[in-house]
């Protein structure tokens, strides 16, 4: 349960909170995270979980946890998401100016958020979320010295979710939920701290949620070819991880099989999304 208390503090303070992730994230990760010419679903799914985690840490200003006197670095996030902290193969994804930064999902900054408040002004009916960052704190602030004492790495950087503030030429997902999907902290924790589930399971779960949740009966038809192209996994991997989600009762699948008149096109399977409860 590595660094579970940092995430649990968010729950204690704010309840079962959520973040909005752009639907274009799946295709962007699949197209940009490859091993040779092929998509690397293991690294893409890690990248997705990484984006979700830093979104929670940024939105609820928990990169530095005053209560636990800890701060979360990339090596910690690797460990939270099932990697050894010394693993180098995924650094190309999360480093400054790495893949996540280059495709515009994140940016790297030393100016991490420390508090937030809602203003009286609104965007699309949502109160504006005003962040205070470490550089905005006065040295006389009661917590300034506490932050500086906890953060021992002088080169400490965090990821800012760019899509929070601007997404597809519109206001960001803090204020515009169009073409996004919701991930709750409960969902994230249910996958991350379950030894029976991994990042690929979470990636596929989020994909099905993005397609089905909010539809009539939370149900939709999706061709297998669509999933394979957008998620970038083999048929065998898709079925293995889909069955894990079915076993957990997160989804139900009504398999339709192949069209008789066209062996190249699959009849859409019907997916029903139940989700973490």
For the regions a protein language model found, what residue spans apply to each?
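Short recognition helix of helix-turn-helix/winged-helix DNA-binding domains
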Residues: 1-88, 113-220
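Winged helix-turn-helix DNA-binding recognition segment
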Residues: 58-121, 213-267
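C-terminal engagement modules used by replication, chromatin/transcription, nuclear envelope/ESCRT
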Residues: 130-140, 151, 252, 260-277
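Long, low-complexity intrinsically disordered regions in eukaryotic regulatory proteins, enriched
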Residues: 169, 175, 206, 236, ...
